[in-house]
Amino acid sequence: MEVAALFPSACALPFGLILVDPQPPARNTGNPAAETVVRTARKAEEGAHMIGFQDLLDRREKIAVVGLGYVGLPLAVHLARHFDVVGYDLKAQRIAELAAGRDRTLEVSGADLAGSGIAFTHEPEALSACRLVVVAVPTPIDEHRNPDLSPLEGASETVGRHLAAGSCVVFESTVFPGATEEVCVPILEKMSGLRCGTDFTVGYSPERINPGDRVHTLDRIVKVVSGSDEPTAELLNAVYGRVVAAGIHRAPSIKVAEAAKVIENTQRDINIALMNELSMIFDRMDIDTIDVLEAAGTKWNFLPFRPGLVGGHCIGVDPYYLTFKAQAIGYHPEMILAGRRINDAMGAYVAQTLVKYLIREGRRVRGARVAVLGLTFKEDVPDLRNTRVVDIVRELADYGVEVLVHDPLADPEEARRYYGIELRSIEAIEGVEGVLVAVLHREYRTMGLERIAAMCADGRPLVFDLKGAFEPEDAGSRGIVYWRL
C-alpha cells in the first residue's frame, strides 16, 4: 500500500516522514493559476525553509490577516505593532473604508487605523509575499442550520493559490473539531501543489473577540494556540505571545483547540436557555425572574446568567457546528439541541406575550403600532448578523401589528437588505400602543424609562424591557405597565 493511502493528509505524518510525489510538476499551460502551482511545487522540490519567529520579528517576512471584520481587524492592528502586516479582505469597499481610517464595526478607532502601518488590500496577489497567514473569516450556518463553510473554503482557496513554500497558515474561525485538517488542508494542498507537513504547516488559534467589549479586549484574553507540529505550535506561541498579555495556552492538538472553542459558546448557550425556560415558568407564576436570580446569586457557586435573546455570529451559531459533527459520527445530541430550540423560540414568545398585554389593556392588536428599540444582535455594536430581534418584528407583523424599528447604530441599508426593515428616526416614534426595548444601546439607557414611556399614546404606557434595565417599582410609581424577562 502506498504511504499516501495510509496518510491522506501529510499533516498527519509521523515526525520526520516525508512524502514524495512521483509525478513531475505540470507543464506551463499559460494558465496563471496553474503556473502558480508549478512555481510553488518547484520551490518545494528545492526544500522549504519554514518560517521562523525571528524572520517575522526582524520584519524580513510578513504576516497576512485574511478577513478584516470584527475578528481580523483588531488582530491585524495588534500584530502590526510588532510585525509587518498585510490586511486582506475580498470586499473592495471595506478596504477603501479602512484605508480612509473608518471602521464600520466600531472596534478600531480612526487614530489606531491611521497609525497601524497595515498594508490594506483586496488584491489576493499580495498574499504571495506573506509567510504567516492568519485566516479570520465568518463561519455561519445555512437556512437548515447546518455549517456553511463556503467563506472558509473560499479563503482557503485564495490562500492556497498564493501560498509560498515554508509558510504557515493559521485559522481562527470557529469550526467543528477536525475541520482544519479535514476541510482546509486538502484545499490548501490542491491549490498550492504543496504538501502540508513537508512544504507548509497549519495551526489553529480560536478567536475570542467579544464585539463592543472594551474590557475583555484581544490582548486581555488568554489565547489558545495549536499547530500541526511542535515547531508550528512554538511559532504561534511566540507570535501571539507578543500581542496577548494575558498569556498563551498551548493545546496538544488542533482538534482539541477546535473543540475548546466550540464548547465555550455551547456552554453559554445552554445556560442562557435554562434562564429563558425559568423566565417563562416564573412569568406564569407571576414571579419576577431577575428578583429570583439576584436572590439565588447570593450563593457562592451560582452562575450569573440572565435570560434574553441569543443572536449574533457566535453563541447562536456555534452549537450547530458541534451538533452537526456529533450527528455525522452517529451521536444525536439532546441537551444542546434542546437549548437551541428554547433560545430560537424566544423572539416569538416575547411577541406573543406583548400581544397578550395589548389585549389585557383593552387595546387593539391588528393595526396597533408598537415601537421596537434596537435591532442589532447586542448592545452598543452595529452588527446585524443573525439578530433575533427580527423574530419579534416578524411575529408581531403576523398578528397585524405595525412595527416601528429604531436603532442608532445599525446601517439602514443593511437592515433593509438583510431583513426588509425600514429603520425609523427616534423623532418619528410617537403615539404608539407599546414600546419594546429589545437592545439596550447606550442611547436608550440615557433616555431612561420615563422618556421611553412617553412615546406611547394617551392612556397607560406599555413598556417591555428584554434586558431588565429598569425597575418594576419605578415603572409602577409612574403608572407604566412594565414587563421584563
Which sequence ranges carry the predicted segments?
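Structural/interface elements that position substrates and couple domains in central-metabolism enzymes
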Residues: E46-L485
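Short, Lys/Arg-enriched N-terminal segments with co-localized hydrophobic residues
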Residues: N31-H49
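Extracellular glycan-interacting surfaces
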Residues: A26
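Short hydrophobic transmembrane-like helices used for membrane targeting/insertion
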Residues: M1-V3, I18-V20, V37-V38
